[in-house]
């Protein structure tokens, strides 16, 4: 019949297309879908494709004014999740025309927007995205990347060492700067503002920036090494954030910091552009990520947030520790660590990687291991993360019984010992404790640290684990 046929029709009639062959320019998404009882997986998968692209709940007259075939998302493959009675991985392909160039904000508004509140689904989780090279080329990405950062810092062949200044809230700017100086003088490469530190009554941002810059230059002069402190530019408005970044540049410091999820992708991308134009490195903290990524059946996996950050821009990002106090299983963590650092990553379901991803010319991001780690973890961290990483010890530096500078010395000695042992061909996983003990014989600072933390472990099973093999 000619003309418009009003009414409601099943999504799967339009949006479930198992015969579809994906294009190189499509954005591909893997969703973990838990349909409501009685809703077939084809209908649920098609509903996800529809609601995150061109569809709405009823047919509309204006559908006839455009080519739905050109613009609609398509659910092209569904597979049951092994070991789960009512979960399916639904693969959806989106035509590239649906997205604004260079906008992570727009990409997420579509793909993880209203569809997550959809009644026909009990739960929905975005497991992975394949970003086509054509879309990647519309993003600047990280301001500098791994190689440029090493060249700026003149540090090669080892992981970098950091420390989050604690107590995270309550110090005056002067005392805060003192702690920064002691840690950097003791041998760390970086110190860090805690993510909660913005500009509170006890320490306004400008005072903190000044005292930290002074600490940094003093430590640089005494050690002959380039030092950095992540000055947190996160603020209540984009304008205020940029004002803080400009002041950091005027002070001549090497690096600023942003909380990219609470600050938002629009603000983050603006800041990343400023950092590239003005030679600032950009450290990214992922505060709020666990709200989005910790539940296994709903939300968004961190590997998607990591990909989005590489597009939006950042030179460092927190990526879990595998061995510390915060969530992160080894295979999954290494999966998205490689996604951050490498140019090309093959599909590998054993590490939770659903798609092959080619980053073309986008620089890499350095993963930061931080949270409940100390000197006994150093061999494992060196082995797991390799050279292109930042290992951050907050309490593991400042909790040293002799103070901050000896805490920094202990970490630097432990790191150098692990790197030396690895370069000599020793097995860090098997001999880690022995390597640390040997080094502590000639470093009293390390010996004291070893004594304090010899029994500390955070042994809980990860919540977000890989699915069993079929």
UniProtKB/Swiss-Prot annotation:
Chief subcellular site?
Answer: plastid
Q: Which SUPFAM superfamilies match?
A: RuBisCo, C-terminal domain, RuBisCO, large subunit, small (N-terminal) domain
State the CDD domains in the record. RuBisCO_large_I
Where is the PTM N6,N6,N6-trimethyllysine found along the chain?
Answer: 5
Give the record's keywords alphabetically: Calvin cycle, Carbon dioxide fixation, Chloroplast, Disulfide bond, Lyase, Magnesium, Metal-binding, Methylation, Monooxygenase, Oxidoreductase, Photorespiration, Photosynthesis, Plastid
| Entry GO MF terms | magnesium ion binding; monooxygenase activity; ribulose-bisphosphate carboxylase activity
Q: Name one GO cellular component term.
A: chloroplast
- Reaction(s) catalyzed by this protein? 2 (2R)-3-phosphoglycerate + 2 H(+) = D-ribulose 1,5-bisphosphate + CO2 + H2O; D-ribulose 1,5-bisphosphate + O2 = 2-phosphoglycolate + (2R)-3-phosphoglycerate + 2 H(+)
Q: Which InterPro entries match?
A: RuBisCO, RuBisCo_large_chain_AS, RuBisCO_lsu_C, RuBisCO_lsu_C_sf, RuBisCO_lsu_fd_N, RuBisCO_lsu_N_sf, RuBisCO_lsuI
Q: Where in the cell is it found?
A: Plastid, Chloroplast
- The protein's Enzyme Commission number: 4.1.1.39
Q: How is it modified after translation?
A: The disulfide bond which can form in the large chain dimeric partners within the hexadecamer appears to be associated with oxidative stress and protein turnover.
* Sequence positions that bind substrate: 114, 164, 168, 286, 318, 370
Record site: Transition state stabilizer: 325
Q: What's this chain's function? A: RuBisCO catalyzes two reactions: the carboxylation of D-ribulose 1,5-bisphosphate, the primary event in carbon dioxide fixation, as well as the oxidative fragmentation of the pentose substrate in the photorespiration process. Both reactions occur simultaneously and in competition at the same active site.
Q: Which NCBIfam families match?
A: PRK04208.1 (NF003252)
Protein family (similarity comment)? Belongs to the RuBisCO large chain family. Type I subfamily.
- Cross-referenced PANTHER family: RIBULOSE BISPHOSPHATE CARBOXYLASE, RIBULOSE BISPHOSPHATE CARBOXYLASE LARGE CHAIN
Q: What is this protein called?
A: Ribulose bisphosphate carboxylase large chain
Give the species this sequence originates from: Kigelia africana (Sausage tree)
Gene encoding it?
rbcL
């Amino acid at each position: 019949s000619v003309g418009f046929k009003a009414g409601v029709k099943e999504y799967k009639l339009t949006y479930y297309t198992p015969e579809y062959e994906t294009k190189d320019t499509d954005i591909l998404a893997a969703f973990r879908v838990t349909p409501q009882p009685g809703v077939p997986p084809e209908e649920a998968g098609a509903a996800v494709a529809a609601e995150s692209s061109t569809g709405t709940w009823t047919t509309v007259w204006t559908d006839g004014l455009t080519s739905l075939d050109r613009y609609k998302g398509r659910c092209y493959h569904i597979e049951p999740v092994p070991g789960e009675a009512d979960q399916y991985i639904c693969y959806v392909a989106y035509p590239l025309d649906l997205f604004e160039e260079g906008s992570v904000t727009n990409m997420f508004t579509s793909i993880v927007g209203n569809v997550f509140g959809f009644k026909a689904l009990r739960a929905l989780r975005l497991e992975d995205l394949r970003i086509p090279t054509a879309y990647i080329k519309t993003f600047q990405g990280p301001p500098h990347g791994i190689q440029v950062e090493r060249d700026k810092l003149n540090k090669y062949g080892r992981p970098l060492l950091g420390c989050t200044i604690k107590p995270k809230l309550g110090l005056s700017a002067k005392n805060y700067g003192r702690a920064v100086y002691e840690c950097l003088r003791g041998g760390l490469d970086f110190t860090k503002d805690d993510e909660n530190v913005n500009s509170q009554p006890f320490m306004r941002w400008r005072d903190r920036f000044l005292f930290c810059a002074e600490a940094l230059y003093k430590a640089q002069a005494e050690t002959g090494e380039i030092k950095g402190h992540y000055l947190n530019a996160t603020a209540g408005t984009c304008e205020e954030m940029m004002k803080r970044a400009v002041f950091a540049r005027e002070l001549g410091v090497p690096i600023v910091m942003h909380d990219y999820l609470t600050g938002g992708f629009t603000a983050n991308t603006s800041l990343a552009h400023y950092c590239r134009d003005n030679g600032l490195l950009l450290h990214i903290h992922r505060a709020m990520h666990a709200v989005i990524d910790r539940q296994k059946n709903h939300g968004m996996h961190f590997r998607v947030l990591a990909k989005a950050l590489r597009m939006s821009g950042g030179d460092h990002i927190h990526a879990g520790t595998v061995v510390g106090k915060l969530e992160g299983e080894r295979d999954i963590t290494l999966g998205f660590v490689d996604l951050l650092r490498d140019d090309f990553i093959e599909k590998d379901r054993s590490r939770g990687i659903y798609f092959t991803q080619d980053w073309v010319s986008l620089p890499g991001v350095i993963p930061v291991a931080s949270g409940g780690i100390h000197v006994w973890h150093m061999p494992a961290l060196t082995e797991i993360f390799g050279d292109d990483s930042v290992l951050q010890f907050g309490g593991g530096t400042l909790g040293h019984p002799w103070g901050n500078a000896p805490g920094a010395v202990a970490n630097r000695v432990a790191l150098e010992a692990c790197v030396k042992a690895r370069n000599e061909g020793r097995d860090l996983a098997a001999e880690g404790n022995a390597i640390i003990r040997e080094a502590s014989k000639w470093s009293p600072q390390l010996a004291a640290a070893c004594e304090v933390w010899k029994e500390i472990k955070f042994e809980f099973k990860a919540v977000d684990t890989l699915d069993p093999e079929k």
